[in-house]
């Protein structure tokens, strides 16, 4: 067995890598639910979004969707860590999981992400379901 095959096998079976992959998957589901919820609200006010490309441009550049950027950036950071060939450490995974826990805390009295997240949870059942899934994932032991 080649060295790269052994490294791949270690990466695939690492409990830390598996935990981070599961959390990433949950975050992507939450991110999608939030985008759909925001799209529906945006369209009620400004009219129909004509294409996926237009939606992508709005998500990246329109102030309406700016509050989602911390979640997008966290997914990118997890992707970069998972793509790195080195062995993950408990500390770096713990830091990322703490960031995820801190980010997905809705607050009626908060501002920025916390407040917008709270509002999305109030109006979109899909966001509630994705939030519950994330809470389950984050309550599982990492090792």
Model-derived features with residue positions:
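Surface-exposed peri-terminal alpha-helical interaction modules
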Residues: 2-143
């Amino acid at each position: 067995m080649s060295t790269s095959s052994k490294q791949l096998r270690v990466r695939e079976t690492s409990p830390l890598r598996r935990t981070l992959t599961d959390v990433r998957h949950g975050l992507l589901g939450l991110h999608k639910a939030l985008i759909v919820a925001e799209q529906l609200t945006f369209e009620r006010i400004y009219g129909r979004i004509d294409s996926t490309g237009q939606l992508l441009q709005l998500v990246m550049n329109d102030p309406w969707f700016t509050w989602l950027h911390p979640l997008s950036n966290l997914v990118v950071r997890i992707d970069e860590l998972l793509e790195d060939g080195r062995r993950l450490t408990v500390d770096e995974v713990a830091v990322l999981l703490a960031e995820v826990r801190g980010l997905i805390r809705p607050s009626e009295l908060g501002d920025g992400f916390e407040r917008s997240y709270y509002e999305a949870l109030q109006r979109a059942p899909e966001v509630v379901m994705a939030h519950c899934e994330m809470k389950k994932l984050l309550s599982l032991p990492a090792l």
